[in-house]
């Protein structure tokens, strides 16, 4: 049972909450390099449209571009046959877009602007900003610079949305260290129809992994080491997957990416807490590791893709592809245990 959940929140949340325990597995299907296209570095998010078509967002030098990706896969094996890209639109009035989700109710797109601390709706053809509102709780505005919202996922029925900050909000504790992870609030929003605003419907505490490697300093001798959440993905049964990424040094600077399945069955709803340290005791979300990769691909975007012939689903990931990382596309096979 969830603890400290209001009657309204519980009625909105429980019907789409996955059952207690862990039930999913991931297997690598294929990994390829996407095209080297101008303005296509710093890819931060991806969302599935239909069949082989995805939308992905890049934010190179704070110039946001949404791309249409054509990624056909073999229906039997999940092998990626190609990755083709074309410019879809340039969303107006954006600054630091890190996440994208297609709205299944009307086909529009929602974008996360980390620096502006906003989730806004756009026309995917013209890039024009559209009416639409996400009522972010005040506590979510207390994020650290460059550690704000990067993730976004919407349920297949279009009535539930999830996001979170990359690492802990300032009143909730420190950033991740080599000894301890960072406490992040997984935030859920709901609406009754496409025209209605998204309203808060719960927050649950998730602890990221501690940093496994040694500090990574840039040319200015700034410590770039971090371990936080770069993406969320909501499955049809209500299960929430998290994508954690780490920058650190083992023998050389490298990226460590992990995908976790979550279990909320014993977690406490902390929506009404202004600071985790000041409130009553709470229970965190449980998690189970499904996939881990270490190397030079910095995976930041993740979404569900089409079904394969055996009923499993593709989980598609894209790497940032900036000067420090590869421009990779990773297809994983998601199936029940």
Residue ranges and their predicted role:
Residues 3-15:
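Bacterial N-terminal signal peptides
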């Amino acid at each position: 049972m969830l603890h400290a959940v209001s009657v309204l929140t519980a009625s909105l949340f429980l019907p789409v909450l996955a059952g207690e325990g862990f039930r999913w597995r991931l297997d690598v299907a294929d990994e390829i390099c996407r095209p080297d296209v101008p303005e296509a570095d710093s890819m931060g998010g991806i969302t599935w449209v239909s069949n082989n078509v995805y939308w992905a967002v890049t934010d190179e030098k704070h110039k946001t571009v949404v791309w249409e990706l054509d990624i056909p896969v073999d229906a039997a094996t999940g092998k990626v046959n190609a990755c083709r890209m074309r410019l879809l639109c340039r969303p107006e009035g954006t600054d630091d877009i890190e996440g994208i989700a297609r709205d299944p109710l009307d086909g529009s797109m929602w974008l996360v602007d980390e620096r502006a601390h906003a989730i806004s709706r756009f026309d995917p053809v013209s890039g024009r900003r559209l009416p639409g509102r996400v009522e972010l709780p005040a506590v979510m505005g207390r994020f650290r610079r460059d550690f704000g919202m990067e993730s976004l996922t919407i349920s297949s029925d279009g009535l539930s949305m999830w996001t979170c900050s990359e690492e802990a909000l300032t009143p909730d504790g420190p950033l991740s260290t080599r000894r301890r992870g960072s406490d992040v609030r997984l935030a859920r929003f709901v609406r009754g129809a496409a025209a209605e605003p998204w309203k808060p419907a719960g927050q649950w505490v998730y602890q990221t992994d501690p940093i496994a490697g040694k500090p990574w300093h840039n040319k200015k001798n700034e410590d770039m080491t971090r371990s936080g959440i770069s993406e969320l993905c909501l499955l049809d049964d209500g299960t929430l997957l998290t994508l954690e990424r780490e920058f650190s040094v083992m023998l050389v600077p490298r990226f460590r990416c992990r995908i976790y399945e979550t279990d909320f069955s014993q977690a406490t709803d902390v929506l009404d807490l202004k600071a985790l340290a000041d409130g009553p005791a709470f229970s965190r979300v449980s998690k189970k590791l499904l996939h881990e990769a270490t190397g030079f691909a910095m995976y930041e975007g993740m979404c569900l893709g089409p079904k394969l012939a055996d009923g499993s689903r593709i989980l598609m990931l894209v790497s940032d592809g900036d000067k420090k990382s590869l421009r990779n596309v990773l297809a994983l096979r998601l199936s029940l245990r």
